[in-house]
């Protein structure tokens, strides 16, 4: 059964541009995959702790030597990793804050880049045969001719992390100039509709099995 993992990082709820774009993607994916399964992971609704010293102690302890408290500390991380490993396609919906991803998405990444699970002990990525679509909403635009193009940290960072864990089939859909919606220059629905074709193409692309 084809499985889509939806990771949401915006705190803006129904007003969120990235969530609106992600919803378009999911609806299109469901049309393509009639028997597909969707896993929803809303990071704003997940009690996602930052990495702590006890967590690191549990992480670096071999599983056979972990105490029950250590296993409890890693339980959510294990769950997040299992979601990724069970998915064929992952869509990450995120705003851009200060040119990078929000803290909650960085915290998520710290929980899913795991030696022995998503990353081999020699550094090779273990998450193979999956596609990822990154859906981003930013106040400004980071197009090739943009004067702030070099400030786009978020895209490169997410591509790098995905490649590190083994996902190289990555499509980025950038909702730049989203501030126009907040300023009343364009309606939210019209802004989202401009990306309908990109969403359809991304949702329809086959996953290259490795």
From Swiss-Prot:
It comes from the Bacteria. Keywords: Flavoprotein, FMN, NAD, Oxidoreductase. Its EC number is 1.6.5.-, 1.7.1.17. Its cofactor is FMN. Binds 1 FMN per subunit. The keyword NAD applies. It is an enzyme of class 1 (oxidoreductase). Quinone reductase that provides resistance to thiol-specific stress caused by electrophilic quinones. Belongs to the azoreductase type 1 family. Homodimer. This is FMN-dependent NADH:quinone oxidoreductase 8. It comes from Burkholderia lata (strain ATCC 17760 / DSM 23089 / LMG 22485 / NCIMB 9086 / R18194 / 383). The lineage of its organism: Bacteria, Pseudomonadati, Pseudomonadota, Betaproteobacteria, Burkholderiales. The gene is azoR8.
């Amino acid at each position: 059964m084809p499985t889509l993992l939806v990771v949401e990082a915006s705190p803006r709820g129904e007003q969120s541009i990235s969530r609106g774009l992600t919803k378009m993607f999911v609806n299109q994916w469901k049309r393509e995959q009639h028997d597909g399964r969707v896993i929803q992971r809303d990071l704003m609704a997940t009690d996602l702790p930052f990495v702590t010293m006890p967590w690191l102690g549990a992480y670096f302890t071999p599983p056979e030597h972990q105490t029950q408290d250590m296993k409890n500390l890693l339980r959510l991380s294990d769950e997040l990793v299992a979601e990724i490993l069970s998915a064929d396609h992952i869509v990450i919906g995120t705003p851009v804050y200060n040119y990078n991803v929000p803290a909650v998405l960085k915290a998520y990444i710290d929980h899913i880049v795991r030696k022995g699970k998503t990353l081999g002990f020699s550094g090779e990525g273990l998450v193979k045969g999956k596609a990822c679509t990154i859906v981003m909403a930013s106040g400004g635009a980071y197009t090739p001719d943009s004067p702030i193009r070099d400030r786009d940290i978020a895209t490169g960072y997410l591509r790098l992390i995905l490649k590190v864990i083994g996902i190289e089939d990555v499509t980025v859909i950038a909702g730049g100039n989203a501030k126009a919606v907040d300023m009343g220059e364009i309606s939210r629905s019209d802004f989202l509709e401009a990306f309908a074709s990109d969403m359809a193409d991304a949702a329809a692309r086959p996953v290259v099995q490795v």
